[in-house]
A protein has these predicted regions:
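Short hydrophobic beta-strand element within catalytic cores of glycosyltransferases
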Residues: 35, 289-293
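N-terminal strand-loop element at the rim of the active site
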Residues: 6-65, 150, 230
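A conserved mid-protein helix/loop that constitutes part of the nucleotide-sugar donor-binding site
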Residues: 14-22, 194, 198-217, 221, ...
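A short helix/loop element that forms part of the nucleotide-sugar donor recognition site in Leloir-type
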Residues: 174-189, 335-336
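Nucleotide-sugar donor phosphate/pyrophosphate-binding loop at the beta->alpha transition
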Residues: 64-68, 103-106, 113-136, 149
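Carbohydrate-associated surface elements
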Residues: 146, 167
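Aromatic "clamp/platform" in nucleotide-sugar-dependent glycosyltransferases that forms part
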Residues: 253, 272
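Conserved acidic donor-binding segment of nucleotide-sugar-dependent glycosyltransferases
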Residues: 301-317, 325-330
Length: 377
């Protein structure tokens, strides 16, 4: 059985971290996880599922002692593959894996945006360090064509990039009225109150401020924000200034994303820049109407695959009008659009497992240049 060590920067409830936890349940290989920082609540969940989680104890970006500690773990484990996730883990993990003599090193690039990577500016130094360590790996997985294009712009050779999008477990998000009622009771939301939902890290680029403004212009509508991050205080202050602090619920990070989505009536994703748009797909899997500004996961799909997912500009007036309209319309939450099935997690896990095999793009995984040509024809 192929033995794989996944190396990730941390295990908070972010999109990349949740995606790893999901893949661990579907990958047909033996997996362990190493987190550079603390394991946290998500790490505890992964351990309860039977997957070992190792904490490297990294104390900051300048903690160079983390590198030999990680290399020792990899050497002792004698893994067939090291698979890294997120910038810091990709840099440290590739170096440590090569120090330990691991035969195959894969990296997934989840969060490479335009001008930033995981919230840090993509300075010349950041790009140079990434390129230098990327060459130590066997292949880099891009979760969307947008990420692949940015990797190429950074100087990563196209033949080293494989596109494998994120996966969704549709069954986990199937609408459950009892779960909706229980989540609303726990959050102090009335069963009949209309709820606009936002899902993701509370950072300025997510533009949740547009949702606060929109809710302030609508009577009796609640805003449920699911996630944590540095913009929370600014959003809470904005809600107070707009006189709607009593109608905005900050739920924080949660392991029960399905329950949070069940409690919503519409998912609003006004982020101006996304590398994939996992939350949008999860909202669709939950039977929600979804309004978004950026979602690479939907960009290349036929319009009929996600009929109730619509793009809106970054304008509070447009969001107010559209959300008010959507909330007036009845919905059948049991209907899930075809777009969700296109990203079935079992298929994504099978693609990764093929990539773990020895040899260039083993088992039929395609270099991004081939898929880009297919998309253009």
């Amino acid at each position: 059985v192929t033995r794989v060590l996944h190396v990730i920067t941390g295990l908070e409830h972010g999109g990349a971290e949740r995606q790893l936890a999901l893949l661990l349940r579907h990958l047909p290989v033996s997996c362990e996880v190493a987190t550079l920082t603390r394991a946290g609540a998500l790490g505890a969940e992964i351990r309860r599922s039977g997957v070992p989680v190792h904490e490297i104890g990294m104390r900051g970006n300048r903690d160079l002692g983390a590198l030999p500690r990680l290399a020792r773990l990899i050497r002792r484990g004698r893994y067939d593959v090291v698979h890294t996730h997120l910038y810091r883990a990709c840099v440290y993990g590739r170096i440590a894996a090569r120090m330990a003599g691991t035969p195959r090193v894969i990296a997934t690039e989840h969060s490479l945006g335009e001008g930033h990577i995981e919230g840090r500016a993509t300075t010349r130094g950041v790009r140079a360090l990434y390129r230098a360590t990327e060459r130590l790996g066997s292949a880099t997985v891009a979760v969307s064509p947008a990420v692949a294009a940015r990797l190429r712009a950074w100087g990563v050779r196209p033949g080293r990039i494989v596109m494998i999008p994120n996966g969704v477990d549709a069954a986990a998000f199937a609408f459950d009225p009892a779960r909706r009622a229980a989540t609303r009771r726990r959050l102090g939301i009335g069963l009949d109150e209309p709820v606009v939902g936002g899902l993701g890290r509370l950072v300025p680029t997510k533009r949740f401020d547009l949702l606060v403004d929109a809710v302030a212009r609508m009577d009796g509508v609640r805003l449920l924000l699911v996630g944590a991050g540095p913009a929370r205080d600014a959003l809470a202050r904005q809600a107070r200034e707009r006189g709607v602090s009593g109608r905005v619920v900050f739920a924080g990070a949660t392991s029960d994303v399905a329950g949070a989505l069940a409690a919503m009536d519409v998912l609003a994703a006004p982020s101006v820049q996304e590398t994939f748009g996992l939350g949008v797909l999860e909202g669709l899997a939950a039977g929600l109407p979804v309004r978004y500004t950026a979602c690479p996961a939907l960009d290349r799909l036929p319009p009929g695959d996600a009929p109730d997912a619509r793009r809106l500009p970054s304008d509070a007036g447009a969001w107010t009008a559209e959300l008010a309209r959507v909330l007036r319309e009845p919905r059948d939450r049991t209907r899930v659009p075809p777009a969700v099935a296109r990203y079935a997690v079992a298929e994504r896990a099978a693609e990764l497992a093929r990539l773990y095999r020895p040899g260039p793009f083993a088992g039929g995984a395609e270099p991004i240049r081939e898929r880009a040509q297919d998309a253009a024809t």
